[in-house]
Regions:
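Peripheral, non-catalytic segments flanking oxidoreductase cores
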Residues: 1-197
């Protein structure tokens, strides 16, 4: 087990360094096999995209509860819409019980689902449920989709380098089945701390 989270720098690949691909692949493989995740740096994504999303998310979470509940998640097995405090407890995944996670969530899936039976037929739920968008802030949708697009491209890049290591058993990804959450954790005093994307 790693004693610290690895930081993997993609800048040499982006700059075209021919020797960097295998080095990055090895670092990604090591992170996947030891800790299970890593911090990726040097990815070239404009930090303004994340800053604009964070600002829009904080404004959304600051709205009164009644306004957020207009787009409340319709069913517990569906990661779409607003999920208020008290509905999720991470420890339940391991069969335990505890007080609910002290967070609120806004969740979406892909916004460009093809109009084909695989995506629209009876077996498509909940993976392809429609997104629920708030009326305000007006830019939340565009900010989330811009961020999604950049993260999806980055994920394809990372996934491609991990495939260079045959010892890793890489599962085929279906990008249409991904979900994307904005979460805000609060202190016990109920003031908003920060948004996690």
């Amino acid at each position: 087990m790693a004693d610290r989270i690895p930081v993997i720098d993609l800048a040499p690949i982006i700059s075209g360094d021919p020797g960097a691909k295998i080095k990055v692949a090895m670092e990604l493989g090591s992170a996947a096999q030891t800790l299970g995740f890593a911090v990726v740096a040097g990815h070239g994504i404009d930090p303004i995209i994340g800053a604009e999303l964070r600002d829009a998310a904080l404004r959304f979470f600051d709205f009164p509860l009644e306004e957020k509940l207009v787009i409340r998640r319709p069913k517990n097995d569906q990661n779409r819409g607003y999920i208020p405090y008290g509905e999720e407890t991470l420890v339940r995944m391991a069969g335990g019980s505890s007080p609910p996670d002290y967070k609120e969530v806004f969740a979406i899936g892909p916004d460009n689902i093809p109009d084909e039976p695989y995506f629209t037929g009876p077996g498509s739920y909940p993976s392809f449920a429609p997104n629920l968008w708030p009326v305000a802030p007006i830019n939340l949708r565009s900010c989330m989709l811009a961020y999604w697009e950049k993260m999806e491209a980055l994920m394809r890049t990372i996934h491609g380098y991990k495939k260079m290591l045959p010892q890793l058993k890489i599962k085929k990804r279906d990008p249409f089945k991904e979900s994307y959450l904005l979460a805000i954790w609060s202190t016990m005093s109920d003031s908003k701390d920060d948004v996690m994307i």
